[in-house]
């Protein structure tokens, strides 16, 4: 039974990222536990948690009160003075709620001060006063501050302001939480209240639930401040009393102020914001004189005609299939129009078609949307759902009214252009991206809490590394999984204290960022529906509600996702088609390539899948080698199988064994066989792999509609036993109607229940398999262009470039080193099929200076020497560091001089070039010749030096600037060791599979060393030996390590003799060392 004595009107959730500790749903649960009839949320300058709070309180049967704590200035003149006060705004009704949205949006747009943060002014308050109750801010409000400063005239001014604009909507706030001057303030407020007739209200400025949370709260605040407990405790301005007191505790605290308690109930009764969550508000799509429904039907039918010609070039084939396609099309259109979503499809159609027309790559599809034929004929997707048995109901279910969700992949580099286009079409004030929130994860909370306690960085780094990277990892799970972490927790008091506090902070909101792809388009101003958050400069608006909450406002989310692979595909096709621009027959359209290319699948079976979408990881390569996919359906299955569920359940082994005839194909197993299952499960060798298969089995067996079947699938995923039992009975009865006995139907239902957790969305699997196939096809037939484009997409990521260059070497592609007379910023392919290294992949040289070099070269075709380069390019950008990096990388080898000479003379050349340029500016023509004569004389001295750097030093420069050895390898200088010692081979011979014995001696350079102690307290070493682009792992056990430890240093050239083993699946060699030289 609710206690109607008191209501908390000032409460911070963890979305007050400075001082909030409690999640909104926990606040609601705790309020219910305390029998509170209502509760407010008043986070600091935001409504981030409002939707979660509103829904949670309603689910608990508690009334939600919506409010915000603001910093406020008297007017704009005071902003620079930092003399702000505090005030709390509570929404009385929906008008007040809308004014909160407008005030918050305005505050983030133009109310930001580096020292204060987000603020509002009193002038804005007046403009947005309708439907708002104000709480004065207590000691920190304008009246409180001026009272305590004995500034009577300002107190009177403030009272006059509130009486004029907020009569009956302004409350003098008092609290007793243990801060200084509270009682002095309260005694004066009592007089003002009596004299002015302004009511008083009691609050507790709640930041945590229980008194014992105070110490943890202190850590939370210091994490936000970025300081330690010892160094900056003065910044902490909170008290142990700021917990959620009970009604009785608040009554006892204010026995001398009974009205201050009863007024909380009065305010709660006045606050009645009603939010409706079951409506959708789509922007208007311009259709001329036609209504939206008819326009969609017209567009779909026109698109269908074009797609049928594309699918069935043969007229008779087209006639044979037209009824099947139009039946499906009309069925989908009927559902879309009945559910009221024609505008949604037209909006998505427009921006996708605009992107395609403007040379912005768009993905072939993503998620369940690929199951829609309407999407296919509108050019939203590039997948024919009928060809792959994809189901529309998996995407849009007429028996479950939810907005459709068409995720769209765009080229990473040009995605923002599509968002800009949408903003122009619908108006900048109607389009926004969506916020996302970072939380204190298991790893980050250890580091953050540890920093507050002052633990050393190295210690915290080691501790956090013990926490696995798995998705959804918690500290509790980490302790149970990692023995080393458990032992530290048990026996190290500091670690135990750190983890115990970290556990209590784990998962709370830490910071804000922008969602990767979410965009909302509103029919009116977005601020009519949600508040906006802007960056510090008042730019880049995002909604204050996250992707999970935005739908409850009625606004529709569109996903504009960036996919780097589309950039790679687009870049590859562009290179190819530019080369063959005069030969139409050789031009390629990546969306029309055959999906039945046998060469493609033979290539796939080699598992040479570096840079192939979704197929790059070692685990995936192992699966490819085992599965040996030989059809597109197998590739679709591959994408679906490579997930923890199938891999851990044994499903993958069954699938592989059935494909290769090592296990009998049953539909699906010995106990549940039935003829109705074979057509559904044939493509997956009798394994239930896809969600669509679950739905079709339910439809065929138990007469479910596909929409109803999707509801069952969702119920199975959620493991909702109450709903499951209802469906179990329905399934049994439906099966009876098809003369299927109860025993068999029960077994099949149980099997479906088991597989529903592992089953994957086939629409998504087909979509991504198509992108995988396209990249595989390009890598097979146009390897140079593909690899160049892949490197261009990652040109800022040197580690990735190194992997891709090594792959080029494996593929025996020719790489032309960086060359200032040949290279551009990006990698490119010349007419002889050589990949020319991109200057943008050289470490430490900015894009602008590289573009200057390339542009200068265009004007003169080539640079004759380094001096010529320096005088031809913007002298401010051609610094000593830039020239050094160009020399070290080999970019200046084209001048025909040893890198040692160039490095020795570069300082003088730069200096001479600058003097020469100055003389030109000063127009001292007589000085030109003298400078050049002097330069040429001195240059000869520099160029004739005999002290050359070693090849090892030059190669080290190369590695330093490029991240890898490109033109040679330090091992090259030690090939004589092969002659000195019998049977010593180089690593590249291993790569070429020239091994005929288990005992081997290999020459290489140590590139990685890791010393470990085994469980039996023995020492061992993991070592990587490398030679050019080949690496091998070497393991050295304790007995060998004791003899050769003195030889183990990074970059040492060494001969390892030992036994070589090759993994059956990964085909990687491992050497167990027996002797080192």
Swiss-Prot record:
Superkingdom in the source lineage: Bacteria
Q: Which InterPro entries match?
A: DNA_pol3_alpha_NTPase_dom, DNA_pol3_alpha_thumb_dom, DNA_pol3_finger, DnaE2/DnaE/PolC, DNAPol_HHH, NA-bd_OB_tRNA, PHP_dom, Pol/His_phosphatase_N
Query: Which reactions appear under catalytic activity for this entry?
Result: DNA(n) + a 2'-deoxyribonucleoside 5'-triphosphate = DNA(n+1) + diphosphate
Q: Where are the transmembrane segments?
A: none
* One GO CC annotation: cytoplasm
UniProt keyword list? Cytoplasm, DNA replication, DNA-directed DNA polymerase, Nucleotidyltransferase, Transferase
Q: Family, per the entry? A: Belongs to the DNA polymerase type-C family. DnaE subfamily.
Role of this protein: DNA polymerase III is a complex, multichain enzyme responsible for most of the replicative synthesis in bacteria. This DNA polymerase also exhibits 3' to 5' exonuclease activity. The alpha chain is the DNA polymerase.
Assembly state and interactors?
DNA polymerase III contains a core (composed of alpha, epsilon and theta chains) that associates with a tau subunit. This core dimerizes to form the PolIII' complex. PolIII' associates with the gamma complex (composed of gamma, delta, delta', psi and chi chains) and with the beta chain to form the complete DNA polymerase III complex.
Q: Specify the protein name.
A: DNA polymerase III subunit alpha
Species whose genome carries this gene: Buchnera aphidicola subsp. Baizongia pistaciae (strain Bp)
